[in-house]
């Protein structure tokens, strides 16, 4: 975030001629992350880089958010941009948030989702008994194939693995680097389960409605650049990690084959989408439409029949 959020703030300030200034506060400085949503609704916070994933229990469109999708729906940044920007998933999320007093600026990449381990995980069958820190639908996937997933704050993950409480963890790749998890997990498993993991920019509707049209345009234009920059930085730094850092860290990269990818897609991801369509989509037409869009996209890409 240090590579992209300060430049976004600077761009808004410069393009607005100093009329619109955003003050940066990092996670937890103003409110706990679960309080971001109500704080935006109340206009206590005006803008946040957050995710509907965190509130999928109370925000039905959270089930459509990129970080909550099961593995191998999107397999490239181009897939993500096609699905969210062109086929209408961002539109559906934005409509759902608008009803809850949130103006939605859109989804963006925060890097690809992988997992890593103390021991080699060479195939899907090796997941049995694997104790792993993951999140959302990734936890559901792990459990389906015999692993034992838990949810744990990122700063606690290193010690849990070092002490043997966990065998590994998974999330956006850069946390493997930033938390030095390569010191306790020398095996990095791919391909990425989510390409990419996503987050979103939310604005308090009250704050957004108070902006004149020219400043709204400034924020929207800066958001487009923010999305591009975030994706570019994540991609460049991930490539550097694979090309250079793995050797320095002593990391072994293990990439599963097509059979395992197809098996996850067929045995878990598609049934997961069908379940969401049935259980959530039956109550919320936006979710039903979104799941239909996602499945048609996967068919068009040849990922499912």
Region spans (language model):
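N-terminal secretory/targeting leader peptides
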Residues: 1-82, 91-305
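Basic, amphipathic alpha-helical recognition segments used for DNA target recognition
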Residues: 88
